[in-house]
Amino acid sequence: MTNLPEHQSSPTEQSSAEVKKIPTMIEGFDDISHGGLPQGRTTLVSGTSGTGKTLFAVQFLYNGITIFNEPGIFVTFEESPQDIIKNALSFGWNLQSLIDQGKLFILDASPDPDGQEVAGDFDLSALIERIQYAIRKYKATRVSIDSVTAVFQQYDAASVVRREIFRLAFRLKQLGVTTIMTTERVDEYGPVARFGVEEFVSDNVVILRNVLEGERRRRTVEILKLRGTTHMKGEYPFTINNGINIFPLGAMRLTQRSSNVRVSSGVKTLDEMCGGGFFKDSIILATGATGTGKTLLVSKFLETGCQQGERALLFAYEESRAQLSRNASSWGIDFEELERRGLLRIICAYPESAGLEDHLQIIKSEIADFKPSRVAIDSLSALARGVSNNAFRQFVIGVTGFAKQEEITGFFTNTTDQFMGSNSITESHISTITDTILLLQYVEIRGEMSRAINVFKMRGSWHDKGIREYVITEKGAEIRDSFRNFEGIISGTPTRISVDEKTELARIAKGMQDLESE
Protein backbone atom coordinates (compact mmCIF):
# COMPACT_ATOMS: atom_id res chain seq x y z
CA MET A 1 0.00 0.00 0.00
CA THR A 2 1.20 3.51 -0.79
CA ASN A 3 2.58 5.38 2.20
CA LEU A 4 0.48 8.49 2.87
CA PRO A 5 1.50 11.62 4.79
CA GLU A 6 0.48 11.55 8.44
CA HIS A 7 -2.22 14.21 8.11
CA GLN A 8 -4.01 12.29 5.33
CA SER A 9 -6.32 9.33 5.67
CA SER A 10 -6.88 6.55 3.17
CA PRO A 11 -9.93 6.74 0.86
CA THR A 12 -11.71 3.95 2.75
CA GLU A 13 -11.19 5.76 6.05
CA GLN A 14 -12.50 9.00 4.50
CA SER A 15 -15.69 7.37 3.27
CA SER A 16 -16.68 6.31 6.78
CA ALA A 17 -15.69 9.57 8.44
CA GLU A 18 -16.46 13.23 7.99
CA VAL A 19 -14.98 14.75 4.83
CA LYS A 20 -11.77 16.54 5.77
CA LYS A 21 -10.66 19.68 3.98
CA ILE A 22 -7.27 21.19 3.29
CA PRO A 23 -6.98 24.98 3.19
CA THR A 24 -6.04 26.51 -0.15
CA MET A 25 -5.00 29.83 1.46
CA ILE A 26 -6.41 31.53 -1.63
CA GLU A 27 -7.80 34.71 -0.09
CA GLY A 28 -11.53 34.32 0.51
CA PHE A 29 -11.88 30.83 -0.99
CA ASP A 30 -11.52 29.00 2.30
CA ASP A 31 -14.33 31.20 3.67
CA ILE A 32 -16.84 30.35 0.95
CA SER A 33 -15.79 26.67 0.90
CA HIS A 34 -16.01 26.41 4.71
CA GLY A 35 -12.39 25.37 5.10
CA GLY A 36 -10.89 24.55 1.72
CA LEU A 37 -11.00 21.63 -0.73
CA PRO A 38 -11.99 18.07 0.27
CA GLN A 39 -8.84 16.14 1.07
CA GLY A 40 -7.84 13.29 -1.21
CA ARG A 41 -10.40 14.16 -3.88
CA THR A 42 -10.38 15.80 -7.31
CA THR A 43 -11.92 19.24 -7.83
CA LEU A 44 -12.89 20.44 -11.28
CA VAL A 45 -12.15 24.15 -11.86
CA SER A 46 -14.06 25.24 -14.95
CA GLY A 47 -14.23 28.54 -16.80
CA THR A 48 -13.99 30.29 -20.14
CA SER A 49 -10.67 31.49 -21.48
CA GLY A 50 -8.99 34.11 -19.28
CA THR A 51 -10.97 33.47 -16.10
CA GLY A 52 -7.92 32.49 -14.00
CA LYS A 53 -8.07 28.69 -14.01
CA THR A 54 -4.32 28.14 -14.42
CA LEU A 55 -3.62 30.78 -11.80
CA PHE A 56 -5.96 29.02 -9.36
CA ALA A 57 -4.17 25.71 -9.97
CA VAL A 58 -0.69 27.23 -9.54
CA GLN A 59 -1.65 29.22 -6.44
CA PHE A 60 -3.11 26.08 -4.84
CA LEU A 61 0.28 24.35 -5.18
CA TYR A 62 2.39 27.40 -4.32
CA ASN A 63 0.51 28.06 -1.08
CA GLY A 64 0.68 24.40 -0.14
CA ILE A 65 4.47 24.40 -0.53
CA THR A 66 5.31 27.78 1.01
CA ILE A 67 2.79 27.74 3.88
CA PHE A 68 2.32 24.06 4.73
CA ASN A 69 5.53 22.57 3.28
CA GLU A 70 3.44 20.16 1.18
CA PRO A 71 5.22 19.25 -2.08
CA GLY A 72 3.19 19.50 -5.29
CA ILE A 73 3.05 18.23 -8.87
CA PHE A 74 1.89 20.42 -11.77
CA VAL A 75 0.87 18.56 -14.94
CA THR A 76 0.60 20.85 -17.97
CA PHE A 77 -1.20 19.86 -21.17
CA GLU A 78 -1.12 23.37 -22.67
CA GLU A 79 1.66 25.78 -21.69
CA SER A 80 5.32 24.91 -21.53
CA PRO A 81 6.97 24.73 -18.08
CA GLN A 82 9.07 27.78 -19.01
CA ASP A 83 5.95 29.86 -19.67
CA ILE A 84 4.34 28.74 -16.41
CA ILE A 85 7.45 29.67 -14.42
CA LYS A 86 7.72 33.05 -16.19
CA ASN A 87 4.03 33.90 -15.69
CA ALA A 88 4.19 32.99 -11.99
CA LEU A 89 7.04 35.47 -11.48
CA SER A 90 4.64 38.33 -12.27
CA PHE A 91 2.86 37.47 -9.01
CA GLY A 92 6.11 37.23 -7.07
CA TRP A 93 6.14 33.43 -7.05
CA ASN A 94 9.56 31.91 -7.74
CA LEU A 95 8.61 28.44 -8.94
CA GLN A 96 12.13 27.70 -10.19
CA SER A 97 13.42 28.00 -6.63
CA LEU A 98 10.81 25.50 -5.44
CA ILE A 99 11.76 23.14 -8.26
CA ASP A 100 15.44 23.40 -7.30
CA GLN A 101 14.52 22.59 -3.69
CA GLY A 102 12.69 19.45 -4.81
CA LYS A 103 9.32 20.71 -3.55
CA LEU A 104 7.67 21.26 -6.94
CA PHE A 105 7.78 19.18 -10.10
CA ILE A 106 6.28 20.35 -13.41
CA LEU A 107 5.41 17.40 -15.64
CA ASP A 108 5.38 18.54 -19.27
CA ALA A 109 2.59 16.87 -21.25
CA SER A 110 2.09 19.80 -23.62
CA PRO A 111 1.57 19.02 -27.33
CA ASP A 112 4.46 18.51 -29.70
CA PRO A 113 5.19 21.87 -31.38
CA ASP A 114 5.95 20.03 -34.66
CA GLY A 115 2.34 18.83 -34.73
CA GLN A 116 3.11 15.16 -35.37
CA GLU A 117 0.06 12.91 -35.72
CA VAL A 118 -0.59 10.30 -33.05
CA ALA A 119 -0.92 6.76 -34.34
CA GLY A 120 -2.80 3.99 -32.55
CA ASP A 121 -5.29 4.09 -29.69
CA PHE A 122 -5.20 6.91 -27.18
CA ASP A 123 -3.77 5.73 -23.86
CA LEU A 124 -2.70 7.68 -20.77
CA SER A 125 -1.05 4.70 -19.07
CA ALA A 126 2.47 6.05 -19.52
CA LEU A 127 1.47 9.50 -18.25
CA ILE A 128 -0.37 8.01 -15.27
CA GLU A 129 2.73 6.04 -14.36
CA ARG A 130 4.90 9.18 -14.63
CA ILE A 131 2.51 11.13 -12.38
CA GLN A 132 2.39 8.26 -9.89
CA TYR A 133 6.20 8.02 -9.86
CA ALA A 134 6.54 11.79 -9.32
CA ILE A 135 4.01 11.76 -6.46
CA ARG A 136 5.95 9.03 -4.67
CA LYS A 137 9.36 10.51 -5.41
CA TYR A 138 8.50 14.01 -4.18
CA LYS A 139 6.03 12.80 -1.50
CA ALA A 140 3.50 15.16 -3.07
CA THR A 141 0.13 15.75 -1.44
CA ARG A 142 -1.23 18.27 -3.97
CA VAL A 143 -1.58 17.87 -7.73
CA SER A 144 -2.77 20.34 -10.38
CA ILE A 145 -3.64 19.27 -13.93
CA ASP A 146 -4.03 22.05 -16.53
CA SER A 147 -6.03 21.50 -18.65
CA VAL A 148 -7.89 18.33 -19.58
CA THR A 149 -9.69 20.20 -22.37
CA ALA A 150 -6.39 20.33 -24.27
CA VAL A 151 -6.33 16.53 -24.34
CA PHE A 152 -9.77 16.37 -25.95
CA GLN A 153 -8.74 18.94 -28.54
CA GLN A 154 -5.73 16.86 -29.56
CA TYR A 155 -7.65 13.60 -30.08
CA ASP A 156 -10.90 12.92 -31.91
CA ALA A 157 -12.17 9.98 -29.85
CA ALA A 158 -13.87 11.92 -27.03
CA SER A 159 -15.32 8.80 -25.40
CA VAL A 160 -11.87 7.18 -25.23
CA VAL A 161 -10.32 10.35 -23.80
CA ARG A 162 -13.08 10.53 -21.16
CA ARG A 163 -12.32 6.96 -20.16
CA GLU A 164 -8.60 7.67 -19.83
CA ILE A 165 -9.15 10.87 -17.83
CA PHE A 166 -11.47 8.93 -15.54
CA ARG A 167 -8.68 6.39 -15.02
CA LEU A 168 -6.30 9.21 -14.14
CA ALA A 169 -8.73 10.75 -11.64
CA PHE A 170 -9.40 7.36 -10.05
CA ARG A 171 -5.68 6.61 -9.68
CA LEU A 172 -5.06 10.01 -8.07
CA LYS A 173 -7.85 9.31 -5.60
CA GLN A 174 -6.26 5.96 -4.78
CA LEU A 175 -2.99 7.74 -4.05
CA GLY A 176 -4.80 10.05 -1.61
CA VAL A 177 -3.62 13.30 -3.19
CA THR A 178 -5.81 16.40 -3.39
CA THR A 179 -6.14 17.31 -7.06
CA ILE A 180 -7.31 20.26 -9.12
CA MET A 181 -8.24 19.67 -12.75
CA THR A 182 -8.94 22.69 -14.92
CA THR A 183 -11.24 22.60 -17.92
CA GLU A 184 -12.66 25.04 -20.46
CA ARG A 185 -16.31 25.89 -20.93
CA VAL A 186 -17.90 27.63 -23.91
CA ASP A 187 -20.35 30.02 -22.23
CA GLU A 188 -20.26 31.79 -18.87
CA TYR A 189 -23.66 30.36 -17.91
CA GLY A 190 -23.85 27.29 -20.15
CA PRO A 191 -22.84 23.66 -19.49
CA VAL A 192 -20.26 23.14 -16.74
CA ALA A 193 -17.56 21.99 -19.16
CA ARG A 194 -16.88 20.98 -22.73
CA PHE A 195 -16.80 17.30 -23.75
CA GLY A 196 -18.74 16.20 -20.64
CA VAL A 197 -15.71 16.40 -18.34
CA GLU A 198 -17.94 16.92 -15.29
CA GLU A 199 -19.28 13.38 -15.75
CA PHE A 200 -16.07 11.78 -14.44
CA VAL A 201 -14.91 14.49 -12.02
CA SER A 202 -18.22 15.16 -10.33
CA ASP A 203 -17.38 15.24 -6.62
CA ASN A 204 -16.38 18.90 -6.54
CA VAL A 205 -16.96 21.63 -9.11
CA VAL A 206 -15.77 25.26 -8.95
CA ILE A 207 -16.75 27.70 -11.71
CA LEU A 208 -14.80 30.87 -12.55
CA ARG A 209 -16.49 33.57 -14.64
CA ASN A 210 -15.44 36.80 -16.34
CA VAL A 211 -18.73 38.45 -17.27
CA LEU A 212 -19.25 41.74 -19.10
CA GLU A 213 -21.65 43.76 -16.94
CA GLY A 214 -22.53 47.11 -18.44
CA GLU A 215 -19.22 48.52 -19.63
CA ARG A 216 -16.89 46.56 -17.35
CA ARG A 217 -15.89 42.96 -16.86
CA ARG A 218 -16.52 41.37 -13.49
CA ARG A 219 -14.84 38.21 -12.25
CA THR A 220 -16.82 35.85 -10.02
CA VAL A 221 -16.32 32.42 -8.49
CA GLU A 222 -19.05 29.92 -7.68
CA ILE A 223 -18.75 26.60 -5.86
CA LEU A 224 -21.27 24.48 -7.72
CA LYS A 225 -20.81 21.54 -5.37
CA LEU A 226 -18.48 19.97 -2.82
CA ARG A 227 -19.89 16.49 -2.37
CA GLY A 228 -20.38 15.37 1.22
CA THR A 229 -19.64 18.73 2.78
CA THR A 230 -21.02 22.26 3.11
CA HIS A 231 -20.12 25.42 1.24
CA MET A 232 -21.59 28.84 0.52
CA LYS A 233 -23.95 29.19 -2.42
CA GLY A 234 -23.92 31.77 -5.18
CA GLU A 235 -21.34 33.87 -7.01
CA TYR A 236 -18.66 35.89 -5.24
CA PRO A 237 -16.55 38.61 -6.90
CA PHE A 238 -12.77 38.29 -7.09
CA THR A 239 -9.79 40.15 -8.47
CA ILE A 240 -6.40 39.09 -9.76
CA ASN A 241 -3.47 41.14 -8.46
CA ASN A 242 -1.04 39.31 -6.18
CA GLY A 243 -2.94 36.15 -6.98
CA ILE A 244 -6.66 35.44 -6.71
CA ASN A 245 -8.45 37.54 -4.09
CA ILE A 246 -12.07 36.58 -3.44
CA PHE A 247 -14.45 38.85 -1.56
CA PRO A 248 -16.65 36.52 0.51
CA LEU A 249 -19.35 39.11 1.23
CA GLY A 250 -21.83 36.45 2.32
CA ALA A 251 -19.32 35.16 4.87
CA MET A 252 -19.08 38.51 6.63
CA ARG A 253 -20.53 38.33 10.12
CA LEU A 254 -22.28 41.10 12.02
CA THR A 255 -20.10 40.61 15.08
CA GLN A 256 -18.21 43.91 15.22
CA ARG A 257 -18.41 45.98 18.40
CA SER A 258 -20.49 49.16 18.50
CA SER A 259 -19.01 52.26 20.06
CA ASN A 260 -20.84 54.95 22.04
CA VAL A 261 -17.94 57.35 21.47
CA ARG A 262 -18.84 60.37 19.33
CA VAL A 263 -16.60 62.06 16.78
CA SER A 264 -17.01 65.56 15.42
CA SER A 265 -18.14 66.25 11.87
CA GLY A 266 -16.09 69.45 11.86
CA VAL A 267 -19.25 71.57 11.77
CA LYS A 268 -20.48 72.50 15.25
CA THR A 269 -24.13 72.95 14.28
CA LEU A 270 -24.16 69.61 12.45
CA ASP A 271 -22.77 67.91 15.57
CA GLU A 272 -25.64 69.42 17.56
CA MET A 273 -28.14 68.22 14.95
CA CYS A 274 -26.70 64.69 15.34
CA GLY A 275 -26.99 64.66 19.12
CA GLY A 276 -23.31 65.32 19.75
CA GLY A 277 -21.60 64.09 16.59
CA PHE A 278 -21.30 60.85 14.62
CA PHE A 279 -20.68 57.52 16.32
CA LYS A 280 -17.05 56.45 15.99
CA ASP A 281 -17.64 53.27 13.97
CA SER A 282 -20.59 54.54 11.92
CA ILE A 283 -20.98 54.99 8.17
CA ILE A 284 -22.27 58.40 7.06
CA LEU A 285 -23.76 59.08 3.64
CA ALA A 286 -24.15 62.64 2.36
CA THR A 287 -26.44 62.59 -0.66
CA GLY A 288 -27.59 65.40 -2.92
CA ALA A 289 -27.34 67.05 -6.31
CA THR A 290 -24.05 68.33 -7.65
CA GLY A 291 -22.85 71.52 -5.94
CA THR A 292 -24.86 71.09 -2.74
CA GLY A 293 -21.72 71.00 -0.57
CA LYS A 294 -21.03 67.31 -0.04
CA THR A 295 -17.28 67.52 -0.66
CA LEU A 296 -17.06 70.45 1.76
CA LEU A 297 -18.59 68.34 4.54
CA VAL A 298 -16.12 65.55 3.74
CA SER A 299 -13.21 68.01 3.84
CA LYS A 300 -14.25 69.40 7.24
CA PHE A 301 -14.73 65.87 8.56
CA LEU A 302 -11.21 64.85 7.52
CA GLU A 303 -9.58 68.10 8.69
CA THR A 304 -11.11 67.81 12.16
CA GLY A 305 -9.79 64.28 12.54
CA CYS A 306 -6.29 65.35 11.50
CA GLN A 307 -6.37 68.30 13.91
CA GLN A 308 -7.00 65.78 16.70
CA GLY A 309 -3.96 63.73 15.67
CA GLU A 310 -5.98 61.07 13.83
CA ARG A 311 -5.04 59.73 10.42
CA ALA A 312 -7.51 60.27 7.59
CA LEU A 313 -7.79 58.70 4.15
CA LEU A 314 -9.64 60.20 1.17
CA PHE A 315 -10.54 58.29 -2.00
CA ALA A 316 -11.53 60.78 -4.70
CA TYR A 317 -13.07 59.55 -7.95
CA GLU A 318 -14.22 62.82 -9.50
CA GLU A 319 -11.52 65.42 -8.78
CA SER A 320 -7.74 65.53 -9.03
CA ARG A 321 -5.44 66.07 -6.06
CA ALA A 322 -4.66 69.63 -7.19
CA GLN A 323 -8.33 70.48 -7.57
CA LEU A 324 -9.19 69.03 -4.16
CA SER A 325 -6.37 70.99 -2.50
CA ARG A 326 -7.38 74.22 -4.24
CA ASN A 327 -11.04 73.88 -3.29
CA ALA A 328 -10.18 72.97 0.31
CA SER A 329 -7.85 75.95 0.49
CA SER A 330 -10.73 78.27 -0.44
CA TRP A 331 -12.48 77.04 2.72
CA GLY A 332 -9.39 77.51 4.88
CA ILE A 333 -8.35 73.84 4.83
CA ASP A 334 -4.71 73.02 3.98
CA PHE A 335 -4.72 69.47 2.61
CA GLU A 336 -1.10 69.71 1.44
CA GLU A 337 0.14 70.55 4.94
CA LEU A 338 -1.86 67.68 6.44
CA GLU A 339 -0.31 65.33 3.88
CA ARG A 340 3.21 66.59 4.67
CA ARG A 341 2.59 65.86 8.35
CA GLY A 342 1.58 62.30 7.49
CA LEU A 343 -1.95 62.73 8.83
CA LEU A 344 -3.79 62.67 5.50
CA ARG A 345 -3.49 60.48 2.43
CA ILE A 346 -5.38 61.26 -0.78
CA ILE A 347 -5.92 58.60 -3.46
CA CYS A 348 -7.29 59.92 -6.77
CA ALA A 349 -8.40 57.65 -9.61
CA TYR A 350 -10.90 57.53 -12.44
CA PRO A 351 -13.70 55.03 -11.67
CA GLU A 352 -13.18 53.50 -15.12
CA SER A 353 -9.49 52.79 -14.41
CA ALA A 354 -10.37 49.48 -12.76
CA GLY A 355 -13.30 47.21 -11.92
CA LEU A 356 -15.28 47.60 -8.71
CA GLU A 357 -13.56 44.61 -7.12
CA ASP A 358 -10.16 46.09 -7.95
CA HIS A 359 -11.17 49.39 -6.36
CA LEU A 360 -12.37 47.49 -3.29
CA GLN A 361 -9.04 45.67 -3.05
CA ILE A 362 -7.15 48.98 -3.34
CA ILE A 363 -9.31 50.55 -0.62
CA LYS A 364 -8.72 47.62 1.74
CA SER A 365 -4.97 47.61 1.03
CA GLU A 366 -4.64 51.36 1.62
CA ILE A 367 -6.60 51.13 4.88
CA ALA A 368 -4.45 48.21 6.06
CA ASP A 369 -1.27 50.12 5.17
CA PHE A 370 -2.17 53.62 6.45
CA LYS A 371 -4.35 52.57 9.42
CA PRO A 372 -6.63 55.64 9.42
CA SER A 373 -9.33 56.51 11.95
CA ARG A 374 -11.44 58.24 9.30
CA VAL A 375 -12.08 57.26 5.68
CA ALA A 376 -13.99 59.19 3.03
CA ILE A 377 -15.09 58.22 -0.48
CA ASP A 378 -16.08 61.03 -2.85
CA SER A 379 -18.18 59.83 -4.50
CA LEU A 380 -19.90 56.47 -4.54
CA SER A 381 -22.10 57.47 -7.46
CA ALA A 382 -19.02 57.88 -9.67
CA LEU A 383 -18.12 54.25 -9.02
CA ALA A 384 -21.67 53.16 -9.86
CA ARG A 385 -21.35 54.25 -13.48
CA GLY A 386 -21.50 51.38 -15.94
CA VAL A 387 -22.05 48.59 -13.38
CA SER A 388 -25.13 46.69 -12.24
CA ASN A 389 -26.97 47.68 -9.06
CA ASN A 390 -26.16 44.29 -7.53
CA ALA A 391 -22.42 44.63 -8.18
CA PHE A 392 -22.43 48.17 -6.80
CA ARG A 393 -24.35 47.15 -3.69
CA GLN A 394 -21.89 44.30 -3.06
CA PHE A 395 -19.03 46.79 -3.38
CA VAL A 396 -20.60 49.12 -0.80
CA ILE A 397 -21.23 46.20 1.55
CA GLY A 398 -17.58 45.20 1.19
CA VAL A 399 -16.33 48.71 1.98
CA THR A 400 -18.70 49.36 4.90
CA GLY A 401 -18.15 45.90 6.36
CA PHE A 402 -14.37 46.31 6.30
CA ALA A 403 -14.58 49.82 7.78
CA LYS A 404 -16.76 48.61 10.65
CA GLN A 405 -14.47 45.64 11.21
CA GLU A 406 -11.55 48.04 11.59
CA GLU A 407 -13.67 50.42 13.76
CA ILE A 408 -13.24 53.27 11.28
CA THR A 409 -15.63 56.18 10.79
CA GLY A 410 -16.62 56.27 7.13
CA PHE A 411 -18.01 59.30 5.30
CA PHE A 412 -19.28 58.69 1.76
CA THR A 413 -20.93 61.01 -0.73
CA ASN A 414 -23.53 60.23 -3.37
CA THR A 415 -24.61 62.52 -6.20
CA THR A 416 -28.26 62.31 -7.20
CA ASP A 417 -29.52 63.03 -10.71
CA GLN A 418 -32.47 65.10 -9.54
CA PHE A 419 -31.62 68.79 -9.23
CA MET A 420 -34.66 69.82 -7.21
CA GLY A 421 -36.52 67.60 -4.77
CA SER A 422 -35.82 63.95 -4.09
CA ASN A 423 -37.69 60.78 -5.01
CA SER A 424 -35.18 58.42 -3.38
CA ILE A 425 -32.00 58.67 -1.32
CA THR A 426 -29.94 56.68 -3.83
CA GLU A 427 -30.69 54.92 -7.08
CA SER A 428 -28.96 51.70 -5.96
CA HIS A 429 -30.80 51.24 -2.66
CA ILE A 430 -27.68 51.44 -0.51
CA SER A 431 -29.28 53.71 2.08
CA THR A 432 -30.07 50.76 4.37
CA ILE A 433 -26.36 49.90 4.58
CA THR A 434 -25.43 53.27 6.11
CA ASP A 435 -25.96 54.44 9.69
CA THR A 436 -26.44 58.17 9.12
CA ILE A 437 -27.86 59.94 6.08
CA LEU A 438 -27.43 63.65 5.45
CA LEU A 439 -29.81 64.92 2.79
CA LEU A 440 -28.59 68.01 0.92
CA GLN A 441 -30.66 69.76 -1.72
CA TYR A 442 -31.49 73.00 -3.47
CA VAL A 443 -34.63 74.95 -2.59
CA GLU A 444 -36.13 78.01 -4.24
CA ILE A 445 -37.30 80.59 -1.70
CA ARG A 446 -38.70 83.94 -2.84
CA GLY A 447 -37.03 83.67 -6.22
CA GLU A 448 -33.59 82.83 -4.82
CA MET A 449 -31.74 79.53 -4.79
CA SER A 450 -30.75 78.26 -1.36
CA ARG A 451 -29.28 75.04 0.00
CA ALA A 452 -30.94 72.87 2.63
CA ILE A 453 -29.59 70.14 4.91
CA ASN A 454 -31.49 67.54 6.90
CA VAL A 455 -30.36 64.66 9.11
CA PHE A 456 -32.61 62.17 7.35
CA LYS A 457 -31.59 59.16 9.43
CA MET A 458 -29.30 58.35 12.35
CA ARG A 459 -29.23 54.92 13.92
CA GLY A 460 -29.13 54.68 17.70
CA SER A 461 -29.37 58.38 18.43
CA TRP A 462 -31.70 61.33 18.69
CA HIS A 463 -31.25 63.78 15.85
CA ASP A 464 -32.71 67.08 14.72
CA LYS A 465 -35.66 66.60 12.37
CA GLY A 466 -35.59 70.13 10.99
CA ILE A 467 -34.70 71.16 7.45
CA ARG A 468 -32.09 73.87 7.86
CA GLU A 469 -30.50 76.37 5.57
CA TYR A 470 -26.97 75.39 4.55
CA VAL A 471 -24.66 78.20 3.46
CA ILE A 472 -21.15 77.91 1.99
CA THR A 473 -18.88 80.83 2.90
CA GLU A 474 -15.14 81.51 2.70
CA LYS A 475 -14.92 79.97 6.19
CA GLY A 476 -16.56 76.76 5.06
CA ALA A 477 -19.94 75.32 5.98
CA GLU A 478 -22.48 77.31 7.96
CA ILE A 479 -25.79 75.79 9.03
CA ARG A 480 -28.51 78.25 9.96
CA ASP A 481 -32.07 78.05 11.27
CA SER A 482 -34.82 75.90 9.84
CA PHE A 483 -36.92 77.10 6.94
CA ARG A 484 -39.82 78.22 9.07
CA ASN A 485 -43.27 78.76 7.63
CA PHE A 486 -42.47 76.62 4.58
CA GLU A 487 -43.53 73.10 3.73
CA GLY A 488 -42.82 70.78 0.81
CA ILE A 489 -39.09 71.54 0.80
CA ILE A 490 -37.93 67.92 0.44
CA SER A 491 -40.35 67.29 -2.42
CA GLY A 492 -38.91 70.32 -4.22
CA THR A 493 -42.08 72.42 -4.11
CA PRO A 494 -41.74 74.69 -1.06
CA THR A 495 -44.97 76.45 -0.15
CA ARG A 496 -45.36 79.26 2.33
CA ILE A 497 -47.90 78.52 5.03
CA SER A 498 -50.00 81.16 6.77
CA VAL A 499 -48.89 82.10 10.27
CA ASP A 500 -50.92 83.34 13.20
CA GLU A 501 -49.10 86.61 14.01
CA LYS A 502 -50.06 86.47 17.68
CA THR A 503 -48.66 82.97 18.07
CA GLU A 504 -45.50 83.88 16.15
CA LEU A 505 -44.86 86.97 18.33
CA ALA A 506 -45.30 84.86 21.45
CA ARG A 507 -42.77 82.35 20.12
CA ILE A 508 -40.23 85.11 19.37
CA ALA A 509 -40.75 86.68 22.81
CA LYS A 510 -40.22 83.33 24.50
CA GLY A 511 -37.03 82.86 22.52
CA MET A 512 -35.75 86.24 23.66
CA GLN A 513 -36.55 85.40 27.29
CA ASP A 514 -34.65 82.12 26.99
CA LEU A 515 -31.60 83.97 25.64
CA GLU A 516 -31.70 86.52 28.48
CA SER A 517 -31.98 83.77 31.11
CA GLU A 518 -28.84 82.10 29.70
Swiss-Prot record:
Q: Which GO terms describe its biological process?
A: circadian rhythm; protein autophosphorylation; regulation of circadian rhythm; regulation of DNA-templated transcription
Q: Where is this region: Linker?
A: 248-260
Q: Which Pfam families match?
A: ATPase (PF06745)
Q: At what positions is Phosphoserine found?
A: 431
Indicate how activity is controlled: The interaction with KaiA enhances its phosphorylation status, while the interaction with KaiB decreases it.
EC number(s) for this protein?
A: 2.7.11.1, 3.6.4.-
Q: How is it modified after translation?
A: Phosphorylated on serine/threonine residues by autocatalysis. Both phosphorylated and unphosphorylated forms exist. Both autophosphorylates and autodephosphorylates. Phosphorylated form correlates with clock speed. Phosphorylated on serine and threonine residues by autocatalysis. Has a 4 step phosphorylation cycle; the autokinase acts first on Thr-432, then Ser-431. When Ser-431 is modified KaiC switches to an autophosphatase mode, acting first on phospho-Thr-432 then phospho-Ser-431.
Role summary: Central component of the KaiABC oscillator complex, which constitutes the main circadian regulator in cyanobacteria. Complex composition changes during the circadian cycle to control KaiC phosphorylation. KaiA stimulates KaiC autophosphorylation, while KaiB sequesters KaiA, leading to KaiC autodephosphorylation. Clock output pathways impact the RpaA transcriptional regulator. KaiC enhances the autophosphorylation activity of SasA, which then transfers its phosphate group to RpaA to activate it. KaiB and KaiC together enhance the phospho-RpaA dephosphatase activity of CikA. Stimulates SasA autophosphorylation. Fully phosphorylated KaiC (tested with phosphomimetic Asp-431-432-Asp) is the best stimulant, requires the ATPase activity of the CII domain. Unphosphorylated SasA associates with KaiC and its autophosphorylation activity is enhanced. Phospho-SasA is released and associates with RpaA, transferring its phosphate group. Formation of the KaiA:KaiB complex is promoted by KaiC, helping switch KaiC from its autophosphorylation to autodephosphatase function.
Quaternary structure, per UniProt, is: Homohexamer resembling 2 stacked donuts rings with a central pore nearly blocked on one side; hexamerization is dependent on ATP-binding. Binds 2 ATP per monomer, at the subunit interface on each ring. The KaiABC complex composition changes during the circadian cycle to control KaiC phosphorylation. Complexes KaiC(6), KaiA(2-4):KaiC(6), KaiB(6):KaiC(6) and KaiC(6):KaiB(6):KaiA(12) are among the most important forms, many form cooperatively. Interacts with SasA, probably as 1 SasA trimer:1 KaiC homohexamer, has highest affinity for unphosphorylated SasA.
Name by which UniProt lists this protein: Circadian clock oscillator protein KaiC
**Lineage of source species:** Bacteria, Bacillati, Cyanobacteriota, Cyanophyceae, Acaryochloridales
